[in-house]
């Protein structure tokens, strides 16, 4: 049986900048730089200027920006036990964020060791420090990759009762089928109450 998935219709949104956070997920050399060992290619090349422009608009409006960086140690169980592809090794060029989207001095960086930006990280503490509260806070999730770390972030913020926005032109993956699977999940019964599919040019801030 063949199941076809379509891209969701992007919605226009108006967000209060003071309650809005732009999350830029794992824009690291390994996947986002042409010299990276696991470079995603054209899909990631396209999103870099879009994220940069959205970031500038959010900063100018008074919103906040947070970055995540996914790193691994050589002896991580993911490699030692489960034999996954060794990647994103801490301290290497591949794990560094790309020059075009490096954090500004006032943009926090959350270092994580799995797809999940909440698991054993400072994310919860940072949200408390920023006074970005469940039920009130607006989180725009961008970056790579759509089916893995972006999906984990969207689900994590949704189950913590934040308003989540996914500009579909600001995430990338190396497999369009998996992009559509992620977007289908975000618009399913379990998440559509708090997740809005949008596009970067349809996000207005006040």
Name each model-derived stretch.
Residues 1-21, 57, 85-206:
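Active-site-adjacent betaalpha module
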Residues 21-32:
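Acidic-leg catalytic submotif of subtilisin-like serine proteases
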Residues 18, 36-70:
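A short alpha/beta connector and helix-capping loop motif
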Residues 70, 77-78, 176-177:
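Short Asp/Glu-rich motifs
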Residues 24, 68, 167:
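Generic enzyme active-site microenvironment
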Residues 30, 73-74, 173:
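Active-site loop signature of alpha/beta-hydrolase-fold enzymes
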Residues 74-79, 118-120:
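Short acidic/glycine-rich loop or secondary-structure boundary segments that cap or lie
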Residues 34-38, 78-82:
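Short acidic, glycine/proline-rich loop/turn micro-motifs
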């Amino acid at each position: 049986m063949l199941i076809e998935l379509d891209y969701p219709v992007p919605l226009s949104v108006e967000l209060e900048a003071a309650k809005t956070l732009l999350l830029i997920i794992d824009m690291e050399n390994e996947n986002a730089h042409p010299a990276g060992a696991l470079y995603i290619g054209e899909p990631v090349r396209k999103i870099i200027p879009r994220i940069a422009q959205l970031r500038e608009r959010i900063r100018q409006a008074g919103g906040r920006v947070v970055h995540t960086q996914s790193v691994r140690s050589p002896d991580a169980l993911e490699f030692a036990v489960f034999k996954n592809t060794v990647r994103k090794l801490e301290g290497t060029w591949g794990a560094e964020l790309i020059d075009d989207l490096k954090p500004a001095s006032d943009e926090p960086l959350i270092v994580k060791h799995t797809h999940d930006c909440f698991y054993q990280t400072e994310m919860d503490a940072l949200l408390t420090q920023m006074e970005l509260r469940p039920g009130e806070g607006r989180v725009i999730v961008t970056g790579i990759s759509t089916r893995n770390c972006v999906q984990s972030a969207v689900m994590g913020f949704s189950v913590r009762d934040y308003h989540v926005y996914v500009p579909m032109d600001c995430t990338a993956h190396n497999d369009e089928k998996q992009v559509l699977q992620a977007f289908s999940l975000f618009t399913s019964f379990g998440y559509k109450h708090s997740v809005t599919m949008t596009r970067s040019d349809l996000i207005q801030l006040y």
